């Protein structure tokens, strides 16, 4: 699974790795460092696999480029995931094709409500307009990709999350949701590294110092290869 987190550096007035960016926790712009993480879960274990520091202004790669690089490295190291889990930020067509076509892996991801799907050949509609009942799993054609299964989660406030998978055998709604719920383990991981490593409390301003102090703490978690 992959997701990014913001290392809050709001009290560091100058930091070469930090920039103003939106924080979901703060519900606004915060000065921070964007860290993109990839994890492997095995039962109740949460195992870090890889990470990247994303710097929008000076990075020659997007977060999606980093995501693909980490996937390729995981593939080269012998990982065989049951599912690759990610949110809508990482569910671009290029990413889905890399996972499903090149690596022959299955994915479960969020889709934004405006992603185009088709029930009838040649007719595309936003997934938000799809006739999709609660707890229904439906087979549709995702534009520029191919057949997928989709379902939706409706929370207590009525907000809707759309999920998609290329595993056309995942027809039972409860199984679909149960597999995707593993993605929340990356949120546990992000909270854990912030609380236990002090990674947000390093106020070095130079990128070279940050890389030398903060991320060896992170990489000290000893990224494994699968057994």
Predicted regions and their residues:
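Active-site-proximal, Lys/Arg-enriched surface segment
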Residues: 1-44
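Single, function-defining residue in the core of a domain
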Residues: 9-14, 44-227
């Amino acid at each position: 699974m992959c997701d990014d987190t913001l290392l809050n550096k709001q009290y560091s007035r100058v930091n070469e790795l930090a920039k103003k960016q939106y924080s979901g926790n703060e519900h606004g712009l915060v000065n921070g460092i964007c860290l993109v993480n990839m994890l492997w879960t095995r039962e109740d274990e949460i195992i870090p696999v890889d990470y990247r520091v994303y710097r929008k202004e000076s990075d020659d790669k997007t977060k999606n480029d980093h995501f693909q690089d980490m996937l390729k490295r995981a593939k080269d190291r012998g990982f065989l995931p049951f599912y690759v889990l990610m949110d809508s930020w990482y569910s671009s067509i290029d990413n889905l094709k890399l996972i499903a076509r090149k690596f022959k892996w299955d994915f479960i991801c969020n889709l934004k409500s405006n992603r185009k799907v088709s029930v009838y050949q040649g007719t595309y509609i936003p997934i938000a307009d799809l006739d999709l009942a609660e707890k229904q799993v439906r087979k549709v054609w995702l534009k520029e990709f191919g057949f997928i299964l989709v379902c939706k989660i409706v929370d207590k406030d009525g907000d809707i999350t759309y999920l998609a998978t290329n595993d056309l055998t995942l027809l039972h709604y409860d199984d679909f949701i149960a597999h995707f719920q593993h993605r929340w383990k990356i949120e546990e991981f992000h909270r854990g590294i912030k609380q236990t490593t002090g990674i947000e409390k390093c106020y070095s301003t130079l990128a070279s110092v940050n890389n030398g102090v903060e991320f060896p703490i992170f990489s000290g978690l000893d990224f494994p290869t699968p057994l």
